Regions:
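Intrinsically disordered, low-complexity boundary segments flanking structured domains
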Residues: 1, 52-54, 79-80
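Hydrophobic, Leu/Ile/Phe/Ala-enriched alpha-helical segments that form helix-helix packing faces
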Residues: 30-38, 85-89
């Protein structure tokens, strides 16, 4: 489980058995669904950009979604949605204070 002191949670597009998660745009889709959850709440046009609390990225050539802990404080159900998405799809995830530069492309 993710600790309450985590800076960010990186959900990786790799399943527990090492397979690449499909569809290939899963990270963008998840981040798109979460775009409404942002500091200050929903604003006109906010659906046109990702929330700073849930961003798609790539680490070491693996698609990821970075979930910021502020999401948990502001929108606990949205946080649980992301964590349950990872669990339900058996995706690997890890905690880090920032994007691991050693793994970054």
């Amino acid at each position: 489980m993710v600790s309450s002191t985590a800076k960010e949670v990186f959900i990786q597009g790799i399943t527990r058995d090492g397979k690449t998660f499909r569809p290939s745009d899963w990270a963008e889709r998840l981040a798109g669904v979460m775009s409404q959850f942002r500091p200050g709440g929903v604003r006109p046009g906010s659906h046109l950009s990702y929330s700073p609390w849930c961003l798609p990225t790539s680490v070491g050539g693996v698609k990821c979604v970075v979930v910021h802990p502020d999401l948990r404080a502001a929108e606990p159900m949205a946080w649980e949605f992301c964590m349950n998405f990872a669990k339900d799809n058996e995706l690997q995830f890890f905690e880090a204070w920032a994007k691991p530069e050693a793994l970054a492309e």
